[in-house]
């Protein structure tokens, strides 16, 4: 019986197999190659890199607009006709796409690091293009439908830019190992210069980025102004259904500065609270009056409005994901809320709470179309609330309002020059936080005009506005913001400059050290680390990438070895690369008939 022994045994390379297998479905040794990556695959790598940065921006955008998720859902509700929480599915999908692209990019960079030829599998190419196209379409849709929300990105950078800069600096510094390794192995000086120039341009740009960073929270602690007052948006809509009596009771319990309410008149002249033009979103009108669900809310008599439930929708749709945290008693109370009269709300808040009133325009055929201002004023004055506590927002009949209630704070929702506002008798502005800059706030304050910004729900945004000097904000999450004792971060300018310069110096030292080490290590490998060669190693070695010059040297040494010594056997051949990867070969101990042949 003849016993056959293998000429060679290659130790398994599990990590390398997983790397090339996941990226290009090349799990076997013979499927891998250290040849140069084709131009087609380089194009796919460029697409992959571009997709990474695009999905990074989109993921950052969607994470930061968490402040406005409810507004986004309400906006889509008005366009689509039904309520659904679109924010979380979009966030989850965006996070999944970003994670997928990031993993592919890391695998591609690992291919470069170990000298493997990149060959992205066709399934990944489909997934990459699907993710890219979906992201582009979604971003374009948001830009067209809600371009105002992109201002949120620039505002958020005031809070995150100093930290994003350090993170980007760490990432680019870490890439120096890969760049330096490629630089050391390149044979053409032109290619080396192009690579180093491009890399250094990125590094220098990052070093200088702090010159463009402007954040109001980079300031001395003693210059920090008072904490902005908090106004509950439609009461406390995270703790109770919006514009209901329970919502305003919860707001008063929070001991906040004021509340905001949306007022409209019923068909028989009773002022009540409702934000939408119809009753579909916040009541069960489709069950009680199915034929009138799309009618304007002002076309219902008060006796009809009293029949509607205004709380079940809150528990069913859970717009702020807070319904599950309600106590048993609050849950039952919320389920039984009804449409709220203006007079009932005023009775709850009249003692120590300010009020911003917003009005809906009535249809022209409404019986009180021309007199609803008078009716509302009578209701407010009859409640006993102090006139100084009322911020009057509608531009309609301002002169009449001044005559009847001269102490009302005349408030405007329009961004105009301070001089024009003063001429109109405006003392307060109520604007969306994306509509004003830090300079606008300071100019208005210098002109003795108070500014209230809406809708501010996140502590980081509240902190930025606090550092800016905003006097008050309107919020859905008053119970959260009232517990913010201090801006999330506040840094003196000298301290920030010290962190900036120190980070740049550390990065520079690491980059220079990496380039020196990689060049020294590569020179040592070329001069003395190559001991013996085997043609099978040249063909099958997949752990490292060697230049054509290195492969030529190995082949020449093998040929001269056979000429000088004849056909010999070797006990063990081992080749280590400059990257630290070993492709070891073990031969049998019985060498009687073993021969190495060159084809």
UniProtKB/Swiss-Prot annotation:
Transmembrane portions of the chain: 43-63, 88-108, 126-146, 161-181, 193-213, 498-518
Glycosylation sites noted in the Swiss-Prot or TrEMBL record: 301, 336, 352, 374, 448
Pfam families: GDPD (PF03009)
Disulfide bridges in this chain: 15-18, 25-576
Modification after translation, per record: Intramolecular disulfide bond between Cys-25 and Cys-576 is reduced by PRDX1.
Leading EC class: hydrolase
Enzyme Commission designation: 3.1.4.2, 3.1.4.11
Domain GP-PDE per the UniProt entry, residue ranges: 228-485
Keyword list, A-Z: Cell projection, Cytoplasm, Disulfide bond, Glycoprotein, Hydrolase, Lipid metabolism, Membrane, Neurogenesis, Transmembrane, Transmembrane helix
Role noted for this protein: Glycerophosphodiester phosphodiesterase that promotes cell cycle exit and drives spinal motor neuron differentiation. Mediates the cleavage of glycosylphosphatidylinositol (GPI) anchor of target proteins: removes the GPI-anchor of RECK, leading to release RECK from the plasma membrane. May contribute to the osmotic regulation of cellular glycerophosphocholine.
Protein name, per record: Glycerophosphodiester phosphodiesterase domain-containing protein 5
Organism in which the protein naturally occurs: Gallus gallus (Chicken)
Gene that encodes the chain: GDPD5
């Amino acid at each position: 019986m003849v016993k056959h022994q293998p000429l060679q045994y290659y130790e398994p390379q599990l990590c390398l197999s997983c790397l090339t297998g996941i990226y290009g479905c090349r799990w076997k040794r013979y499927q891998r190659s250290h040849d140069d990556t084709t131009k087609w695959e380089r194009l796919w790598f460029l697409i992959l890199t571009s997709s990474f940065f695009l999905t990074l921006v989109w993921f950052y955008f969607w994470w930061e607009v968490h402040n406005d998720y409810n507004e986004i859902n309400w906006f889509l509700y008005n366009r689509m006709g039904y309520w659904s929480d679109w924010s979380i599915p979009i966030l989850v999908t965006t996070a999944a796409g970003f994670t997928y692209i990031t993993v592919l990019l890391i695998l591609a960079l690992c291919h470069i690091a170990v000298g493997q030829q990149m060959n992205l599998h066709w399934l990944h190419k489909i997934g990459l293009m699907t993710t890219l196209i979906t992201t582009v379409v979604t971003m374009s849709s948001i830009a067209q439908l809600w371009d105002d929300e992109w201002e949120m990105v620039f505002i958020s950078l005031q809070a995150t830019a100093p930290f994003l800069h350090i993170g980007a600096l760490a990432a680019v510094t870490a890439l120096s190992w890969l760049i330096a390794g490629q630089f050391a192995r390149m044979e053409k000086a032109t290619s080396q210069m192009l690579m180093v120039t491009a890399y250094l341009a990125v590094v220098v740009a990052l070093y200088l980025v702090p010159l463009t960073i402007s954040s109001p929270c980079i300031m001395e602690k003693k210059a920090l102004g008072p904490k902005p007052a908090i106004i509950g948006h439609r009461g406390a809509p995270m703790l109770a259904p919006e514009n209901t009596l329970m919502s305003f009771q919860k707001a008063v319990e929070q001991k906040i500065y004021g509340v905001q309410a949306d007022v409209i008149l019923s068909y028989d002249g009773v002022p009540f609270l409702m934000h939408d033009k119809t009753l579909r979103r916040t009541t069960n009108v489709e069950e009680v009056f199915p034929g009138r669900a799309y009618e304007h809310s002002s076309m219902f008599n008060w006796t009809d409005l009293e029949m509607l439930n205004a709380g079940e929708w809150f528990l069913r749709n859970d717009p702020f994901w807070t319904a599950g945290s309600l106590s048993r008693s609050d849950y039952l109370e919320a389920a039984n809320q009804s449409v709220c009269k203006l007079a009932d709300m005023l009775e709850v808040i009249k003692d120590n709470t300010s009020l911003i009133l917003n009005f809906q325009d009535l249809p022209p055929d409404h019986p009180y179309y021309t007199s609803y201002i008078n009716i509302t004023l009578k209701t407010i004055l009859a409640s006993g609330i102090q006139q100084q506590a009322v911020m009057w927002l509608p531009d309609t009949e301002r002169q009449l309002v001044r005559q009847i209630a001269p102490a009302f704070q005349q408030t405007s929702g329009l961004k105009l020059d301070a001089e024009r506002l003063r001429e109109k008798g405006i003392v307060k502005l109520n604007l969306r936080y994306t509509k004003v800059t830090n300079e606008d706030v300071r100019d208005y304050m210098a002109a003795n005009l108070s500014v209230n910004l809406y809708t501010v729900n996140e502590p980081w945004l509240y902190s930025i506005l606090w550092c800016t000097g905003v006097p008050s904000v309107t919020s859905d999450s008053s119970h959260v913001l009232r517990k913010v004792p201090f801006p999330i971060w506040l840094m003196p300018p000298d301290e920030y400059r010290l962190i900036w310069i120190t980070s740049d110096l550390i990065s520079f030292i690491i980059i220079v050290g990496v380039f020196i080490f990689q060049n020294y290590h590569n020179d040592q490998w070329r001069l003395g680390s190559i001991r013996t060669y085997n043609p099978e190693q040249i063909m099958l070695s997949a752990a490292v990438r060697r230049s054509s010059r290195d492969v030529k040297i190995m082949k020449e040494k093998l040929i001269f070895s056979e000429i000088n010594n004849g056909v010999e056997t070797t006990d063990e051949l081992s080749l280590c690369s400059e990257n630290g990867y070993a492709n070891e070969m073990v031969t049998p101990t019985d060498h009687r008939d073993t021969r190495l042949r060159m084809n």
